[in-house]
């Protein structure tokens, strides 16, 4: 598991998750989703980006557990997913940043 949650804090425990969170667009997405659940189009409108440019980022964030689907709605013949940030705060496990020097 690449993360643990502690009292509203998402703790990153692996490099894959750290790389995902390091992306500026993904940071913006998480900031928007911290406030309330929204779908990809709503987030895209807030960020001034095309929804098609965000699907990859949403998938990466969901894959590592930084965001989650909290609601689905049927709109005509489409299903809209509403996402929310998993936690309000992110921290990095200090052991992930420990570098040993072998001699």
List where the protein language model places each region.
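Short capping segments at the starts of secondary-structure elements
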Residues: 24, 35-42
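Pre-recognition alpha-helix immediately N-terminal to the DNA-recognition helix
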Residues: 27-31
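Short, Lys/Arg-enriched N-terminal segment that forms or immediately precedes the first helix
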Residues: 3-18
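Conserved segment of winged-helix/HTH DNA-binding domains
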Residues: 18, 64, 74-103
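Short coil turns linking two alpha-helices in DNA-binding domains
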Residues: 50-52
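A short acidic, leucine-rich amphipathic alpha-helix
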Residues: 42-48, 61
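Short helix-coil-helix linker/hinge
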Residues: 19-26
């Amino acid at each position: 598991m690449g993360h643990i949650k502690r009292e509203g804090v998402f703790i990153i425990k692996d490099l894959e998750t750290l790389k995902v969170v390091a992306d500026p667009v993904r940071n913006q997405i998480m900031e928007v989703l911290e406030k309330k659940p929204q779908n990809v189009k709503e987030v895209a409108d807030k960020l001034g980006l095309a929804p098609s440019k965000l699907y990859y980022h949403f998938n990466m964030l969901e894959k590592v557990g930084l965001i989650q689907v909290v609601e689905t709605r049927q709109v005509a013949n489409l299903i809209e997913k509403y996402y929310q940030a998993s936690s309000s705060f992110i921290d990095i496990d200090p052991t992930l940043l420990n570098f040993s020097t072998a001699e």
